[in-house]
Amino acid sequence: MAFFSSRVRALFILVLVLPLCSETGFARSKKTRKEPDCDVYRSHLFFCTREMDPICGTNGKSYANPCIFCSEKLGRNEKFDFGHWGHCREYTSAARS
């Protein structure tokens, strides 16, 4: 009976831990992701969800997700493009010189 309970315990732990491990394996790499298609957001600028999928623009600003990035790019007079996926790095004045 002790063998059975240890086997059930191991299976229970596996069922709890497996989803946590497998979700990270499905995340797309920053290097393999393509630039967002801003034409998708053209008809509804600034009507964006609050999901976090950060984008760094060439203007050095971080945008929370592709919708906000594209809305700012298409709806403002500023000229900037897609830099990379993820937050922009903040540089100190000492690092720039």
Curated annotation (Swiss-Prot):
Chain segments annotated as coiled-coil in the UniProt record: none
GO CC field: extracellular region
GO molecular function: serine-type endopeptidase inhibitor activity
Reactive bond (site feature) positions: R50, E51
Subcellular location: Secreted
Domain Kazal-like: 32-90
Signal peptide region: 1-26
Disulfide topology: C38-C70, C48-C67, C56-C88
Tissues in which the protein is found: Seminal plasma.
SMART domains hit by this protein: KAZAL
Keyword Secreted annotated: yes
Primary role: Inhibits acrosin.
Name of the featured protein: Sperm-associated acrosin inhibitor
Species of provenance: Sus scrofa (Pig)
